[in-house]
Amino acid sequence: MHCDIYKFLKHDDMYIYIARPDYPNDTDEIKDWLGVLPKDFRAGLGRSKFVMHLDLATTPALARVDKEEVLAKLASQGYFVQLPPQDVMRRQAELHARESQDSIYNT
């Protein structure tokens, strides 16, 4: 299974894998590959940036996620969301809380 991987400027360390089951026969026309994402979810992501194209059949393992889980989600829904590690999410939440608190008390 081939897929494209995108990241989003609003969400550090979150990557979305988009299935490309017909690759390379699907390159004749320009297509909105992110169109498989639910509209509300996609709207909250902000601007996307293409990271890379990946052939999962020739990739032995993935760094942060289970390859079989990625393949299953790509086959069933057409995309897979790789969330940041818990420590990154915790740091982002703490930073956001501090910034919110600072804006309340420094006005």
From Swiss-Prot:
Q: Give the top-rank taxon of the lineage listed in the UniProt record for this protein.
A: Bacteria
Taxonomy of the source species: Bacteria, Pseudomonadati, Pseudomonadota, Gammaproteobacteria, Moraxellales
Q: Where is the YcgL domain?
A: 1-95
Q: Which InterPro entries match?
A: YcgL-like_sf, YcgL_dom
**One of the Pfam families matching this protein, by short name:** YcgL
PROSITE patterns membership: YCGL (PS51648)
Which HAMAP family does UniProt cross-reference here?
UPF0745
Identification of the protein by name: YcgL domain-containing protein Psyc_0800
